[in-house]
Amino acid sequence: VDFNVPIKDGRITDSNRIQATLPSIQAVLDNGAKSLVLMSHLGRPDGRRDEKSSLRPVAEQLQTLLGRPVTFLEDCVGPEIESACADPAPGSVFLLENLRFHPEEEGAGVDESGNKFKPSQEQVQTFRDSLTRLGDVYINDAFGTAHRAHSSMAGINLPQRAAGYLMGKELEYFSRALENPNRPLLVIMGGAKVSDKIQLINNLLDNCNEMIIAGGMAFTFKKVLDNLEIGNSLFDEAGAKIVQGIIDKAAERHVQIHLPTDFVCGDKFETGCNVQTYSGNIPEGFMGLDIGPELQEAMAQAIQRAETIVWNGPPGVFEIPEFRAGSERFFREIVAATRDRRVVSIVGGGDTAAFAKTMGDESDVISHISTGGGASDP
């Protein structure tokens, strides 16, 4: 399951991902499973135990939502965990501790000195074998991590395997919208790094008619393509090497790419900072944290042309009020198109879905808000 939920001071601030898995969990229990072992990650602890990333609060919340006991286990592998899951009382529900406390889950970690390392193949296999011994049937309902080649996704060797209800719902919606969409298909891309989204961008360039590139990744595009001075804005060294290839593919596929021409900038990454809007070069000491009014207008026109819209990644740092306007404009234009013209609108990616939820009841107008993070990167 994907229980990667926001936790502040030990309290879950948004339980949507937990609630989204309840139909699958209830179906397993109602259909005679002797026990249910749930596993998930939370945050990015880099292969080390970190109490701030413990799933214990999730177990407590899940117990309340299910109305039945949920046993929280202090680890996810090893003899003690295997013993606890081997012959439990009928109807038992277990939640394992965060899979990412072990570097073998992601195949990489960071030691206490801050140095990156990789566990051996033997260590990874031992970890996978222990997870495999915890059950008889493997059900994947973690749409938010389904795109990752992690041990819990790709390394559990059980012959009986199935997709959960949430996974099925997400896959059905994305395939219906992207394999045979009403056109034009507009993709709005945000996010910090080009290199993190290269596979997504390449996949979508095969299907879409227009693409808006905003968010932190836009600065890498602008610096590479236009030699723009970007001040203290985010720059992705790895992503810079693939920018031209993306532009070339877009031209080859006749996809119109929209990049920002103006930016709302701050001298600090915090509310109350000095805010300036720059069209063109950004001076040293300032960083771009939202799109300016010029791209907002171009984006509004693209949305008015579209019949299907996929939005993945906010264009600005919406958590800071001064840099929220671009995200709100995107959202309201998409809501209007969905409501007034029956456009199919899909909001995907953890940050984008979180932003949509902050807009209250208006978010109900969106055709589909995905529970996935990077996995809703089709």
UniProtKB/Swiss-Prot annotation:
PANTHER family: PHOSPHOGLYCERATE KINASE (PTHR11406:SF0). This is Phosphoglycerate kinase. The gene is PGK. Keywords: ATP-binding, Glycolysis, Kinase, Magnesium, Metal-binding, Nucleotide-binding, Transferase. The keyword Cell division does not apply. ADP binds at residues 191, 215, 318. AMP binds at residues 192-193, 197, 216, 288, 319. It catalyses: (2R)-3-phosphoglycerate + ATP = (2R)-3-phospho-glyceroyl phosphate + ADP. It is an enzyme of class 2 (transferase). (2R)-3-phosphoglycerate binds at residues 1-4, 16-17, 40-41, 43-44, 99-100, 147-148. Pathway: Carbohydrate degradation; glycolysis; pyruvate from D-glyceraldehyde 3-phosphate: step 2/5. Belongs to the phosphoglycerate kinase family. Monomer. Its cofactor is Mg(2+). Its EC number is 2.7.2.3. Mg(2+) binds at residues 192, 196, 351. CDP binds at residues 191, 196, 215, 313, 318. The keyword Membrane does not apply. CDD domains: Phosphoglycerate_kinase.
